[in-house]
Amino acid sequence: MGPLGRAWLIAAIFAWALLSARRGLAEEAEASPSPPPSPCPTETESSAGTTGATPPTPNSPDATPEDSTPGATTPVGTPEPPSVSEHDPPVTNSTPPPAPPEDGRPGGAGNASRDGRPSGGGRPRPPRPSKAPPKERKWMLCEREAVAASYAEPLYVHCGVADNATGGARLELWFQRVGRFRSTRGDDEAVRNPFPRAPPVLLFVAQNGSIAYRSAELGDNYIFPSPADPRNLPLTVRSLTAATEGVYTWRRDMGTKSQRKVVTVTTHRAPAVSVEPQPALEGAGYAAVCRAAEYYPPRSTRLHWFRNGYPVEARHARDVFTVDDSGLFSRTSVLTLEDATPTAHPPNLRCDVSWFQSANMERRFYAAGTPAVYRPPELRVYFEGGEAVCEARCVPEGRVSLRWTVRDGIAPSRTEQTGVCAERPGLVNLRGVRLLSTTDGPVDYTCTATGYPAPLPEFSATATYDASPGLIGSPVLVSVVAVACGLGAVGLLLVAASCLRRKARVIQPGLTRARALGSAP
């Protein structure tokens, strides 16, 4: 068979396959009827009603779950949703029965509708769900139902009645302090909250255009609306604090019907973070104090220390929490590091504070500082020329001064700079002088180097000078006696030397004569 013959054979086989596939699809469509068409909007609305039900009035109030109490009654004109079985279609009196076919024959499996689909005898029509009744209008509208404001700031939330049913109604404003958001990511303060959860408290009642009740204990915290205009009901808080944050509920009672409107109010304040590095002595370690002051809400801060950018273990820090009378919390963290050497450079100490304003909002604050390291001064006290002298070596210039402490009180003194410290550039040497006391007996002279920052200790040196009359009459007498004693000692030495010389002269001739006699034959 040539190439042309093979091409005709392939085309014939392909055409036969297409015809077979189309025939199979047609048979399958005839055996499986399509689902019934969806009902038109007119049928859905009519089938949703119940027998004898009346449509809702246009001005009926909306009784939604958030605006009505659980015990609130349903308005008379509101239709109830019909009870629809899961397997049976809804039966209503408002939908007419289906008309018989035009040819008078009952519908069967072989009878098709106008669009070609079976009109009966096939699959049963699934039940159509009934339409929910229309919602009532809300009786009260507020511009915001969840409000968050800064701490101690005034708050105003505009609310107003949306319907006309205000005459003769009793309006009440309730307040409840509740346990607000507490982040589990923050550190526990372990202190008592002065404003814990409390039961609801009635703040204000208005009826028939006059004030029926006003809380004497809490009323000064609010500005209540005027009873002459029951349609305008704003919520005004003079200062939003831990004592006034919570849930506020407007409630309207009209006979057996009770409606409510809830507004949730919360407050917050970010901490004021500061770091104060503590002065240190060479080789004594480092310390710093971090403060996160006056923050709210509780358990909303987390604190970490860093040394030269690296985290510091929590065991090196000690935290203390406090709460004031207004409900604001504060924390103080003291960091102590002992691994220091005399020649080490002071580190950079950083305090990071994470503050959780709400469940989904986190802000971070940090402060850092470097401790100042001081060298202990070298102090020495001695007495010279009727004066007490104090020498202080290697002290900060312009900051440190010398103070004398003596039993007889204050006496004239002077302090002067004698040079620079050779061992530590930038430090100087001081010399303080004070007259000796006129008090008889032993007297202690204490010299103190003042001006070092807290919490460094005071550096001092003490020496005792005995001015008893039995020993010396005065400082001048001491000098005279010393000179006399010296001269007396010199005189004694001269006398002794003269005596020895004379004795040597007397003995010398006798020895010469004896030697001469001994040498004669």
UniProtKB/Swiss-Prot annotation:
GO cellular component: membrane; virion membrane
Major subcellular location class: virion
Cytoplasmic-side positions: 497-521
Subunit structure: Interacts with host complement component C3; this interaction inhibits host immune response by disregulating complement cascade.
Virion surface side: 22-475
Residue pairs linked by disulfide bridges in the UniProt entry: C142-C159, C290-C351, C390-C447, C394-C421
Glycosylation sites: N111, N164, N208
InterPro entries registered for this protein in UniProt: GA_GC, Ig-like_dom, Ig-like_dom_sf, Ig-like_fold
Gene designation: gC
Membrane topology, from the record: Single-pass membrane protein
Function: Essential for the initial attachment to heparan sulfate moieties of the host cell surface proteoglycans. Plays also a role in host immune evasion by inhibiting the host complement cascade activation.
Region (Disordered), start-end ranges: 24-138
Membrane-spanning intervals of the chain: 476-496
UniProt-recorded name of the protein: Envelope glycoprotein C homolog
A Pfam entry, by short name: Marek_A
Sequence ranges assigned to domain Ig-like C2-type in this UniProt record: 386-451
Family: Belongs to the herpesviridae glycoprotein C family.
A biological-process GO annotation: symbiont entry into host cell
Compartments where found: Virion membrane
Signal peptide stretch: 1-21
Origin species: Bovine herpesvirus 1.1 (strain Cooper)
Stored PROSITE patterns: IG_LIKE (PS50835)
